[in-house]
Amino acid sequence: MGTLACGKAIAAKRYSQNWNEWFWQSCLGKSKCSKGMPGEHFPLAAPRIGRVERPARAQREGSDAVATSYASIASKADLLAADAARDVALCGRSLHVDAQVRADLASAGVHEPTPTPYFVLEELLGKLGLTANDRLLDVGCGTGRVLAHAASQLPCRATGVELDARLANIASSWAASFPQLDAIAGSVLDISLAPYTCFYLFNPFDTAVLTRFLDKAEREAARPFTLVHMSDNGESFAYQGRPGWRLVRSGSIQMFQTASGRSIKFYEFPQHFSVWRYEGMQ
């Protein structure tokens, strides 16, 4: 093995070992580290909510596999596979949506379920400074990727609401093992928003429905509240001019940086996001 190849192998091994320790410490609420892993977007924001204990052997085997998959990412396909492995390690099952459900949703004119990558969730939700007093609502939660992220990386309670009952049932089936998580089958327009202090949207509906949702949130949600809108391309204007709303942060995400510092294009085009704060009308 050449010097360069040997150096890369050693770095990957160290990265895998460090990620392995960080991953399960953060999942089990034991980490005291405040630094993210090199080249990733996974800073540790203490404190953590402990997840339900899994058998030690399953934890070790699962964390080893996930650590190895993230350490060796060289393409978008690798990143998708690593996120899928992380789903299984966190949730005890795959969050994949089978082809028949996707076909049914497409025939009904519903947006195809698209889970947010973990590195995007860390970039958007990990920087909010949420506390144990907050409560997050993922609007259009699908099978529960945001809930999985919340269980291991956020100190607050989290709820997902999903219009398609089959997807909601998948999220509910594994989230039931976590006392700080729950999933609801139904429309966000039909549930009370009173308990929530933070909302996450990954382009779940068109502008007309978004406007109805914003009206409802203003009436019902706890104030002040924060709203994170990923892939708001073309819809950010819906917030502009609404009394009481303030733009906290905005930008775009397209690339993922690997452990070696290489950038991989994840989205074909930059996906715009915005973070808003609603404090009510003065």
Predicted features by range, described:
Residues 55, 60-131:
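S-adenosyl-L-methionine
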Residues 133-140:
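Conserved class I S-adenosyl-L-methionine
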Residues 144-148:
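Glycine-rich SAM-binding Motif I of class I
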Residues 157-162:
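Conserved SAM-binding motif I beta-strand of class I
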Residues 171-172:
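Conserved SAM-binding loop
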Residues 178-187:
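Conserved SAM-binding strand-loop segment of SAM-dependent methyltransferases
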Residues 197-209:
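A short SAM/SAH-binding and catalytic strip from SAM-dependent methyltransferases
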Residues 208-273:
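C-terminal substrate-binding/active-site "lid" region of AdoMet-derived donor-dependent transferases
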